[in-house]
């Protein structure tokens, strides 16, 4: 059995630790920070807003917040990070100054009205391009009034932007979503002194009476990154894998539960229960069966491209529905998955809110065909999750990915670890 510490810190927690430090009064320490491009964007923006960032050890930082958020003299560049743009929008909505947030072409084409509308419910002064649909975003910080908001989508980024505004508003605000999204923001902020209460699925957020408490966070491994190697184990005969030190928040392990329903042997071993549950995940290869994914989409939406690869190895037709938000990610992930599968000759079809895949069960005929004829180049669409999902498929098929380097956005060690897995020499180092 292979034991693997993927050394890929959780992206969600890394972003939040940096952003929340700006609401503290004293220096904060973040250990095992994810040095991916997205999280580094959040760190750079914190510096541009006046925070002092010191590198104290490998992947660890001491962040000293400014006495007051500084109005930057330049655009705040979020690059490809939607989390940075959406959470900073909530934070800056009540801060004195003019703030412009922009990103690369991909980010500036992703939907931003989903955060502008709830922030405007506070009477925040925020504008976006094309009638508030897209970035760049312009924010003129101003006093906020408390509000009650019911979100039409389950999105941790929307919820987090709302909470960050609500903490700075005049009076208590409430937020409701139709399905529980990731709850790291609520957990972290409550541990730092924020008054956030869950009343039968409705969040009540009271304004901060004092700055957040200083913190010293050590960030666990990202379950979304770990899932790529759970997938690798699930599609590789006779494989057994132990993933170490993984964040096991129940809102983040939906993909592991789906893979378990498909037939893979998966067990969890909780190691600690401090701020968040952290532990090990044991995976063993087994024949896979088809699955229909239609509920609790928020708990696995980032992993659906990887799950589509598992569906390819399953017996029967697998279906994904109610996942329209996949079209609003770094790429249109429904189109990306289906177009690549069709190029490989896989029976599949896309819907407005999902797709279906006819599992091959036996992939050897496809492998034999590609050994005689060069397979088509897999298009990553410059989307890290599409690139990594199809890279795992190269364990079974001789494929090439057009831009695997985009994995550096969230998982800089991915390519090296996958190559070691292919060679059978993966030792967790």
From Swiss-Prot:
According to its UniProt record, what is one Pfam family this protein matches? EPSP_synthase
Say yes or no: keyword Cytoplasm present. Answer: yes
Cross-referenced CDD domains: EPSP_synthase
Q: What's an example GO cellular component term for this entry?
A: cytoplasm
Q: Which reaction does it catalyse?
A: 3-phosphoshikimate + phosphoenolpyruvate = 5-O-(1-carboxyvinyl)-3-phosphoshikimate + phosphate
**PROSITE patterns for the chain:** EPSP_SYNTHASE_1 (PS00104), EPSP_SYNTHASE_2 (PS00885)
Indicate which residues the UniProt annotation says bind phosphoenolpyruvate. 11, 82, 110, 157, 333, 385
Q: What is its main location?
A: cytoplasm
Query: Hey, which pathway is this one from?
Result: Metabolic intermediate biosynthesis; chorismate biosynthesis; chorismate from D-erythrose 4-phosphate and phosphoenolpyruvate: step 6/7
- Highest taxon of the source? Bacteria
Sequence positions that bind 3-phosphoshikimate: 11-12, 16, 155, 157, 302, 329
What GO annotations for molecular function exist for this entry? 3-phosphoshikimate 1-carboxyvinyltransferase activity
Write out the annotated subcellular location. Answer: Cytoplasm
Which EC number applies? 2.5.1.19
Catalytic site residues? 302 (proton acceptor)
Report keywords, A-Z: Amino-acid biosynthesis, Aromatic amino acid biosynthesis, Cytoplasm, Transferase
Report the family membership: Belongs to the EPSP synthase family.
Q: How does it assemble?
A: Monomer.
User: HAMAP family recorded for this chain?
Assistant: EPSP_synth
Name of the protein in question? 3-phosphoshikimate 1-carboxyvinyltransferase
Which source organism does the UniProt entry give?
Answer: Helicobacter pylori (strain P12)
Q: What is the organism lineage in this UniProt record?
A: Bacteria, Pseudomonadati, Campylobacterota, Epsilonproteobacteria, Campylobacterales
Q: Which gene encodes it?
A: aroA
């Amino acid at each position: 059995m292979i034991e693997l510490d993927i050394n890929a810190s959780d992206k969600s927690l890394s972003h939040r630790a940096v952003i929340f430090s700006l609401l503290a009064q004293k220096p904060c320490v973040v250990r095992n920070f994810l040095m991916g491009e997205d999280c580094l964007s959040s760190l750079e923006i914190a510096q541009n807003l006046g925070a002092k960032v010191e590198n104290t050890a490998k992947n660890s930082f001491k962040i000293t917040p400014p006495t007051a958020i500084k109005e930057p003299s330049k655009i705040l560049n979020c690059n490809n990070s939607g989390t940075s743009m959406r959470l900073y929008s909530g934070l800056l909505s009540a801060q004195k100054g003019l703030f412009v947030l922009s990103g690369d072409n991909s980010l500036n084409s992703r939907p931003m009205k989903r955060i502008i509308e709830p922030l405007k419910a506070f009477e925040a002064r925020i504008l976006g391009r094309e009638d508030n649909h897209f970035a760049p975003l312009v924010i003129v910080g101003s006093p906020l009034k408390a509000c009650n908001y019911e979100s039409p989508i389950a999105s941790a980024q929307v919820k987090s932007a709302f909470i960050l505004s609500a903490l700075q508003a005049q009076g208590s605000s409430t937020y409701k979503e139709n399905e529980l999204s990731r709850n790291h923001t609520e957990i972290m902020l409550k541990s730092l002194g924020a008054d956030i209460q869950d009343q039968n699925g409705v969040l009540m957020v009271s304004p901060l009476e004092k700055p957040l408490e200083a913190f010293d966070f050590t960030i666990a491994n990202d379950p979304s990154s770990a899932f790529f190697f759970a997938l690798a184990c699930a599609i590789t005969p006779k494989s057994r894998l132990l993933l170490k030190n993984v964040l096991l928040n129940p809102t983040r392990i939906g993909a592991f539960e789906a893979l378990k329903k498909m037939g893979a042997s998966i067990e969890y071993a909780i190691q600690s229960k401090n701020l968040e549950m952290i532990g090990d995940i044991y995976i063993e290869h087994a024949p896979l069966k088809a699955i229909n994914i239609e509920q609790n989409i928020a708990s696995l939406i980032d992993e659906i491209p990887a799950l589509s690869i598992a569906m390819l190895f399953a017996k029967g037709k697998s279906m994904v529905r109610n996942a329209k938000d996949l079209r609003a990610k770094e790429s249109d992930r429904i189109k990306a998955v289906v177009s690549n599968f069709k190029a490989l000759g896989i029976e599949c079809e896309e819907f407005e809110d999902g797709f279906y895949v006819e599992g091959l069960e036996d992939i050897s005929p496809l492998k034999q065909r590609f050994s005689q004829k060069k397979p088509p180049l897999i298009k990553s669409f410059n989307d890290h999750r599409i690139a990594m999902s199809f890279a795992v498929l190269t364990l079974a098929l001789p494929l090439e990915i057009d831009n695997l380097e985009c994995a550096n956005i969230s998982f800089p060690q991915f390519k090296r670890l996958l190559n070691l897995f292919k060679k059978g020499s993966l030792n967790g180092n």
